[in-house]
């Protein structure tokens, strides 16, 4: 199969729709399907497990290495408390700008609110690895200088445009075209 013509808008749209969605998707924050189960917290603070954990599930006590994305944008784990308490609606909830305490819980990562980690964002590896492309030439000026006509001889011509201008009348009689349908003279009526 040949490559599509990417000069047309329909081909461009078709090509973008066929891209791998994982390249531009938001990363999934759940590490295993067991995180999706609704778990009731035990008064001791440890979430209950209904059975043996699957082989792919994450152990809450184990340290998971941070990804490059997590290092660059300063994420932390969300507390495993009730939903109202994490959103600041529960009893004893503090202001919205305070960071939630990192407790070993379900392992869901949350991005910070506001400028909490501005220093971490300023020192990302993307900024360190950036190199400006040197192959760029400066753009040319788009202003076009008006051309001036310089005459070497003087004439009796007045500079105003209407001084003596007269449009030439050209009357040309065209040769008759026998294949033309409506070439009849005006008073003649064609019966179709």
UniProtKB/Swiss-Prot annotation:
<protein>
    <recommendedName>
        <fullName>MAP6 domain-containing protein 1</fullName>
    </recommendedName>
</protein>
<keyword id="KW-0963">Cytoplasm</keyword>
<dbReference type="GO" id="GO:0005516">
    <property type="term" value="F:calmodulin binding"/>
</dbReference>
<dbReference type="GO" id="GO:0030705">
    <property type="term" value="P:cytoskeleton-dependent intracellular transport"/>
</dbReference>
<dbReference type="GO" id="GO:0005798">
    <property type="term" value="C:Golgi-associated vesicle"/>
</dbReference>
<feature type="lipid moiety-binding region" description="S-palmitoyl cysteine">
    <location>
        <position position="5"/>
    </location>
</feature>
<feature type="modified residue" description="Phosphoserine">
    <location>
        <position position="160"/>
    </location>
</feature>
<keyword id="KW-0112">Calmodulin-binding</keyword>
<comment type="subunit">
    <text>Interacts with calmodulin.</text>
</comment>
<feature type="region of interest" description="Disordered">
    <location>
        <begin position="36"/>
        <end position="106"/>
    </location>
</feature>
<dbReference type="GO" id="GO:0005801">
    <property type="term" value="C:cis-Golgi network"/>
</dbReference>
<feature type="region of interest" description="Mn 1">
    <location>
        <begin position="123"/>
        <end position="136"/>
    </location>
</feature>
<keyword id="KW-0449">Lipoprotein</keyword>
<feature type="lipid moiety-binding region" description="S-palmitoyl cysteine">
    <location>
        <position position="10"/>
    </location>
</feature>
<dbReference type="GO" id="GO:0070507">
    <property type="term" value="P:regulation of microtubule cytoskeleton organization"/>
</dbReference>
<comment type="similarity">
    <text>Belongs to the STOP family.</text>
</comment>
<dbReference type="GO" id="GO:0005874">
    <property type="term" value="C:microtubule"/>
</dbReference>
<keyword id="KW-0597">Phosphoprotein</keyword>
<keyword id="KW-0206">Cytoskeleton</keyword>
<feature type="compositionally biased region" description="Low complexity">
    <location>
        <begin position="43"/>
        <end position="58"/>
    </location>
</feature>
<feature type="lipid moiety-binding region" description="S-palmitoyl cysteine">
    <location>
        <position position="11"/>
    </location>
</feature>
<dbReference type="InterPro" id="IPR007882">
    <property type="entry name" value="MAP6"/>
</dbReference>
<feature type="region of interest" description="Mn 2">
    <location>
        <begin position="158"/>
        <end position="170"/>
    </location>
</feature>
<dbReference type="GO" id="GO:0000226">
    <property type="term" value="P:microtubule cytoskeleton organization"/>
</dbReference>
<keyword id="KW-0564">Palmitate</keyword>
<dbReference type="GO" id="GO:0007026">
    <property type="term" value="P:negative regulation of microtubule depolymerization"/>
</dbReference>
<feature type="modified residue" description="Phosphoserine">
    <location>
        <position position="38"/>
    </location>
</feature>
<keyword id="KW-0333">Golgi apparatus</keyword>
<dbReference type="GO" id="GO:0008017">
    <property type="term" value="F:microtubule binding"/>
</dbReference>
<comment type="function">
    <text>May have microtubule-stabilizing activity.</text>
</comment>
